[in-house]
């Protein structure tokens, strides 16, 4: 519930909402909120008090509410290890699906150098200020990683991904790191986290959901 206070004497109405146990955002413009009113009230569970003249602060608070819903509707794909399982994160409700790491690099090996991959590689090389080490084939392989991850997300009905990148590179099961793929995903507003780090991926996801 969004409560917009317009008078210093309106806090009793906000108290009614708080006592009802309904999560509330209380917008109290400067002049309607002083220490006596805010000190204890702002510490009540489920209450977020905004004392500002800027209504954008309300918009940001509502984005946080929206982000909570988005987390609950998200499935994060974790590519690591050799087991398949799915759990649900406490409080946030995000589904975390773990699949064997082999799934990724085996799909990569089957992924042809599609026109999409060539176009992505061409675009990345064209947009680069300078190219020090990667060969043309390196960028094509990096683009294949992007296409592979897209297919994997679709196959697993997931909205975000984090992979055991270093593990795949050090064991040489993929020819290039998936870093460019991660960059392209992030640019598109889709989370691609590094090193199969669930909490790192969740942090990336939060920044996307708050935009």
Question: Which ranges hold each PLM region?
Answer:
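An N-terminal assembly and electron-transfer interface module characteristic of large anaerobic redox
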Residues: 1-211
